[in-house]
Every structure is written in C-alpha cells, then in structure tokens.
From Swiss-Prot:
Protein name: Uncharacterized protein C27D6.3
Organism: Caenorhabditis elegans
Transmembrane segments: 81-101
Origin superkingdom: Eukaryota
Transmembrane helix in keyword set: yes
Length: 118
C-alpha cells in the first residue's frame, strides 16, 4: 500500500456509491481501508496481545481546574467572614450579660455605679 503512487485528487472507482458520497477520491479509499477492522485470529498469540494491551493502560491523572485556587480562596474568605460574624455576636452577648449583671448589683441605678467616674 505504501508503494502505490497515488494522487489524492484522483477519482476512485466506486460503483453505485457516487450518489451517496458525491464521488470518492483515492484519499478516501485509503482512509476507508485503514478504518476497516482486521479479522481476529484465534489462538494463544491473540491472548498475549490482549494482555499486553491491558498492561499498557495508564492511570487517569486529575486535571487541575482553571479556577481551583480562586475557589479555594473564596471558601477561605467565606469562612473568615462567618467566623467574624460569630465572634461579633459573642462579644455582643458578653456585653449584654455584663450589663445585666452590673444592673442587678446596682439595683438598676447606673448613676450610683458610675458615680466614681464623674
């Protein structure tokens, strides 16, 4: 097949297929021959070739996402934001609890408690 001097613009001799393919060229004929499956021979040699083909497989490597690092930063930023909100709420509750405790100690009169400051 490699020794054939074929021009890729030559028309092939297709009988009855000209309407379907719109005319065939030598290039299409060669590609058609390459695409045909070879007949399998039964025997031990065929089994060995299958085993070799199975051994040649490679593991699939995880392809890094284009935006993976950006998504990671968004997750970290979101976690920090939520943590900030939680810390602010805890501080607010501490101030409210401290106010309740001091108001109960002073009998609800903050002027008496604040008198040393004024």
């Amino acid at each position: 097949m490699a020794d054939d001097n074929v021009s890729f613009t030559d028309q092939g001799t297709a009988v009855g297929d000209e309407k379907k393919k719109g005319g065939s060229s030598a290039m299409l004929d060669m590609l058609g021959q390459l695409e045909k499956k070879e007949t399998k021979k039964k025997g031990k040699k065929n089994k060995k070739s299958k085993k070799k083909a199975k051994k040649g497989k490679t593991k699939k490597v995880r392809k890094a996402d284009k935006y993976e690092s950006q998504n990671f930063l968004f997750r970290v930023e979101g976690a920090m934001f939520c943590a900030g909100i939680i810390v602010a709420m805890i501080m607010l509750f501490v101030i409210i609890i401290y106010g309740i405790i001091t108001s109960s100690q002073t009998g609800g009169q903050f002027n008496r408690y604040m008198a040393p400051l004024f």
